[in-house]
């Protein structure tokens, strides 16, 4: 598949092979990662990458866009069908740019916005001080209840009434419970705010009908197209309001982007077509079943799941019962070919670079075909490693590392990813 890369750039070819090997023979539990289909990968590697297409279908600033117009229209139409909305912009290069475009469409620098605190499960673009959103807006953050570790909507309402934000953002990157979009919209309406829902993490679940569709309540919905959607890395913005759609389009181009990535937009179209199938719905149902099972098995073995469990594809695991940091856990599991990410937990006492938890997700494991019985095996392996972490450098006895590596390899060989489908 990469014969020309091999001829022209052996070093990059080697990188591709090593990364292919890492994905094929390791367990991927990072909640924001997934494995795109070969159809999506092929679309991204097509000649569509050569075409500049500033503007929108039928209104381009360059000639020769007749075929990329077809690709973008297909992507838009399929996104609208998938999420039952009237309007879709599929040009954002990422979820962060989708959020930026949505914010800029309805606000001005210096306006007040409300979003979930990053340390409580939000996202950088929801007002973190180091992000553009925290630099150009007056940010009011809400969090989860210190006892239940779920959103307290009465507290959100109190903050909104006090600060009168222009935008209220719902959604997060490490929140495992169903969000009440109806309640958020009621709060937004009460204070005259726009409700923007960032569904990047759970878009696939929404597409499959097993998570409430935020488009029923939000003024604007943003998302990535990878993660649970299993498409190319990119973003999109959805709305049912024609005037907001016009503002969103201007905000993306010429507001914050120039030429769209037409090869990625074509891959988005492929992804949306895949997501409209019954097979995709079955996949998403299994993702949630696997997440619930993994959380249950980890709890049985002494770990604490933040908020008491999960309704989605992800969970946040509190490592304090084992006196292990998120940083050490990430390193130790990585040595055993199990990929996770360290993550802060509510009421965090450590630096984000150390953290007290890890975030786990099941989309990538489920893409391989794994089910509940494999989640039990994986929970056993995770706990075996974590119980034997020696220090902050994530050191574990070689015998344990070798044993877990072997079991991980066996699991991956039982559920191959691209093996036999891609010619190296």
Curated annotation (Swiss-Prot):
Q: Name one GO biological process term.
A: tetrahydrofolate interconversion
Cofactor(s) of this protein? pyridoxal 5'-phosphate
Q: What is its EC number?
A: 2.1.2.1
Q: Key word Cytoplasm present in the record?
A: yes
Pathway recorded for this protein: One-carbon metabolism; tetrahydrofolate interconversion; Amino-acid biosynthesis; glycine biosynthesis; glycine from L-serine: step 1/1
Cell compartments where the protein resides: Cytoplasm
Site (Plays an important role in substrate specificity) residue list:
226
- Which UniProt keywords are present, listed alphabetically? Amino-acid biosynthesis, Cytoplasm, One-carbon metabolism, Pyridoxal phosphate, Transferase
> What is stated as this protein's family in its record?
Belongs to the SHMT family.
Question: What is the designated name of this protein?
Answer: Serine hydroxymethyltransferase
Organism for this UniProt entry: Thermosipho melanesiensis (strain DSM 12029 / CIP 104789 / BI429)
Organism classification: Bacteria, Thermotogati, Thermotogota, Thermotogae, Thermotogales
State which gene encodes it: glyA
């Amino acid at each position: 598949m990469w014969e020309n890369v091999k001829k022209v750039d052996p070093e990059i070819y080697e990188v591709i092979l090593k990364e292919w090997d890492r994905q094929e023979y390791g367990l991927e539990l990072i909640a924001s990662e997934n494995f795109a289909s070969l159809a999506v990968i092929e679309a991204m590697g097509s000649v569509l990458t050569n075409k500049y297409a500033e503007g929108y279908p039928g209104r381009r600033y360059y000639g020769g866009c007749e075929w990329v117009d077809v690709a973008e229209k297909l992507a838009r139409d399929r996104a609208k069908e998938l999420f039952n909305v009237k309007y879709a912009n599929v040009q954002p290069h990422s979820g962060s740019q989708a959020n930026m475009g949505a914010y800029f469409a309805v606000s001005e620098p210096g306006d007040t916005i409300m979003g979930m605190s990053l340390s409580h499960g939000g996202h950088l673009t929801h007002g973190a001080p180091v992000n553009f959103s925290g630099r150009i807006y007056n940010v009011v953050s809400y969090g989860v209840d210190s006892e239940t570790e779920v959103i307290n909507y009465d507290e959100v309402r109190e903050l909104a009434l006090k600060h009168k934000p222009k935008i209220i953002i719902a959604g997060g990157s490490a929140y495992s419970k169903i969000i009440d979009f109806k309640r958020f919209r009621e709060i937004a309406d009460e204070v005259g705010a726009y409700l923007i829902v960032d569904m990047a993490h759970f878009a696939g679940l929404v597409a499959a009908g097993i998570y409430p569709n935020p488009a029923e309540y939000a003024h604007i919905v943003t998302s990535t197209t990878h993660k649970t959607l299993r498409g190319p890395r990119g973003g999109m913005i959805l709305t049912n309001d024609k005037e907001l759609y016009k503002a969103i389009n201007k905000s993306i181009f010429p507001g914050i982007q120039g030429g769209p990535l037409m090869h990625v937009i074509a891959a988005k179209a492929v992804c949306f077509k895949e997501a409209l199938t019954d097979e995709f719905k079955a996949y998403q149902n299994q993702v949630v079943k696997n997440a619930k099972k993994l959380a249950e098995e980890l709890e049985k073995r002494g770990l604490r799941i933040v908020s008491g469990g999960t309704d989605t594809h992800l969970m946040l695991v509190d490592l304090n019962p084992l006196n292990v940091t998120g940083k050490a856990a990430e390193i130790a599991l990585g040595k055993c070919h199990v990929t996770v990410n360290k993550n802060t937990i509510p009421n965090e006492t450590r630096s984000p670079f150390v953290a007290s938890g890890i975030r786990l997700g099941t989309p990538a494991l489920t893409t391989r075909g794994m089910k509940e019985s494999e989640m039990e095996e994986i929970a056993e392996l995770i706990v075996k490693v974590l119980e034997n972490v020696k220090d902050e450098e994530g050191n574990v006895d070689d015998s344990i590392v070798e044993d877990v590596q072997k079991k991980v390899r066996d699991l991956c060989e039982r559920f191959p990813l691209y093996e036999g489908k891609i010619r190296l």
